[in-house]
Each structure stands twice: as C-alpha cells, then as structure tokens.
A protein has these predicted regions:
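Conserved eukaryotic protein kinase-like
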Residues: 3-352
C-alpha cells in the first residue's frame, strides 16, 4: 500500500511523516495493521444501515465480518477538511490507542486512510454498550445482576485509573458515559472512543479546550469553562456509578417539573439517609442493600463540587473493592449544572 499517496491530498508533510513513522513502528504490534477500503466495505456490506451500530460526534460505527470470520467494528471518522481537526484528532487517536493495552480498554486493531476519509478498526463487542443494556426497551434491555454491575463498575474504574495514572503522558478521556462502555461476550467492560481524548504532560495541571462530552455526565467546571483535568473524568465516572446502581437516567426531562438531575436526587436522599430508596428495583433479591448504598456514597465522593476532594481513580478502585473504607472520606456538596444554558461550547462541538 502506498501510504504517502493516500495521505498527500489532506495531510501536511510534517503530520504525514509523524503518522508514517508511528505506523511503521507499530504495524506488527499484536496484529495492528492497515486495512484496504475493499476489505472494510466487504466486511460491513458496503457500510449498510443494517450494519450501523452507533453514531457520535466523531463519526459512525459499523459492525463487520472479515473473510477469515473475525468480527470487527469500523469507525468512520467525520473529517472537516477546512479546519483539519479531523486529521489531528485521527493522528492523536491512532498513536495513543495503538500503544495502549489494558483489559478494560478497547484495542485499536488497525486503520485505513482514503484521501480525506479515515477509518479505525476495533474488535467487535458482542454485547453492545452498557447504555444498550441499561436503557434498552423490551427484549433489548438486559437484566444485569448486582454482581454484573459491580464487576462493570470496577472494570471501568480500573481502565480509567490506567489512563490517568499509568499511561505517560496521561490521558483524559473527556466522554465517560454508558454508551462509551462496551461489553464483550463475558460482559467485561471496555472503555471506548478515545477520539475525544487529549494527551498532555505531567507538568500541566489542566488544559482549556473545547467542551466535548455528553450533558448529564459533564463535570460543571468543564462544561461551563472548558477547564479540564483528570478530576473531570472522575466526576463523569461518579455519575455513571449512580446511574448503574439506581437504574435511572442522568437527566430526566419532565414538561411539568422541568429538568431533573440524578446527582441532585441522590444528594437529597443522602441528606435524609434514604439512599436505599434509589436502588434499582429491577435488581435481584440477593442484592446487599448496604453494599449498594456504599457504592452510591462512592459516587457522591466522585461528583463533589470541590475538585480537590474528588478521589483519584485508583482510590475509587480501592473503595469499590472494599480495600478502603468509604467512611474515611467526608462527602461534601456535589457539583451539577443548574442551567444547561450555562454550558459554553464552541461552534461545532458535539454533545452526543
């Protein structure tokens, strides 16, 4: 494959060289390789609507099957040629993901570049996303046991802790939500969509950038000002935790009552010592209510308004594993967005 000829129309020579060198360094790394367009087109039945399994701010995702029988997921990135943001984001995602290996992270298996079009190839996750399991209707909704939910939360926390504390430079995901948690055939959770991730060195405490993420999970300081740190991910994880334990949406919209925020509801029940009332009623009867309540308290620790009081993800893992007592940490007022109109997003920023 003539790598340079495919990229020359849209990539600067500097970016092209960086991508080429990165690819050549990694092409034999655990099967990571370049796919031809015909391979991906054939695998996805011509990127048919029937094979489409997801869509977000950075593009659409299709399921496919290669000639050898292996199932894959293909993400077709949306590229804005004028701004070239697509190219930079593609390179960042490619170079970071192809070098990351953790059991709770989706692995990038390869890519294809066709002029200004970029395609990323991943392993296909048999059980779709956590959002599909929690929010599906009728037969599409899975009845996840309490043990399954615990395992999912611990897995997600471990994946985030790896990105925050073991990858150098560390990675802030920026879009932790149920639809970005994929479940394999054993329901092991895999963090997906690093197209929204930013890499920055340890000497930087934060990076101000365009807001990317989903309303309901966004940390207030990030949503309003674009002030981004690892603690922004911790907040989003806390919301996800509350969502999984309660089985409730992060934000409910009611014509009569207006916006209803899960974080505020949990905080209100915490103050009246009634957290047990928020445990998902569809959970099996074998659930230990005390344990579920402790999990919700961990969620509240993660969504505290004061970012310095939010635990690091490794500490959250320790608490979820009951290696650290939640009682050792005082829970303070949570942060939440009072008015969605306060969110300052640059033009073109997606909220999907």
């Amino acid at each position: 494959m003539k790598f340079r000829s495919l990229l020359s129309t849209c990539c600067s020579s500097r970016s092209l060289n960086a991508m080429e060198n990165s690819w050549h360094d990694r092409q034999d790394n655990e099967g990571f390789r370049v796919y031809s367009y015909n391979e991906l087109k054939s695998a996805t039945n011509g990127f048919s609507a029937a094979n489409k399994v997801g869509e977000g701010g950075f593009g659409s995702v299709y399921k496919g099957r290669l000639r050898d029988g292996r199932k894959i997921a293909v993400k077709v990135l949306s590229v804005e040629v004028e701004s070239m943001r697509g190219e930079r984001e593609f390179i960042a995602e490619l170079t970071s993901l192809s070098n990351i290996r953790h059991e709770n992270l989706v692995v990038l298996k390869g890519f294809h570049v066709d002029g200004c079009q970029r395609y990323l190839v991943y392993d296909y996750m048999e059980n779709n996303s956590l959002a599909h399991a929690l929010q599906g209707v009728g037969e599409n909704r899975m009845r996840l046991s309490w043990q399954a939910r615990k395992d999912i939360l611990i897995g997600v926390a471990r994946g985030l802790a790896y990105l925050h504390e073991e990858v150098n430079p560390h990675i802030v995901h920026r879009d932790i939500k149920a639809s970005n948690i994929l479940l394999d055939h054993n329901f092991m959770p895999k963090l997906a969509d690093f197209g929204l991730a930013k890499l920055f060195g340890e000497n930087l405490s934060h990076v101000s950038t365009r807001v990317a993420g989903t309303i309901g999970y966004l940390a207030p300081e990030y949503a309003v000002s674009g002030h981004l740190t690892r603690k922004s991910d911790v907040y989003s994880f806390g919301v996800l935790l509350l969502e999984i334990v309660s089985g409730r949406a992060t934000v409910d919209f009611d014509m009569d009552r207006g916006e209803h925020h899960l974080v505020q509801k949990v905080w209100d029940h915490y103050n009246t010592n009634e957290l047990v009332k928020l445990i998902d009623p569809t959970l099996d009867t074998n659930i230990r209510e005390e344990e579920a309540v402790q999990f919700m308290k961990i969620g509240l620790l993660c969504v505290q308004e004061n970012t310095t009081k939010r635990p690091r993800m490794s500490v959250a893992v320790s608490m979820l594993m009951r290696e650290t007592d939640v009682k050792d940490h005082k829970i303070s007022q949570p942060g939440h967005i009072i008015d969605f109109m306060d969110i300052k997003m640059d033009k073109g920023t997606s909220s999907t």
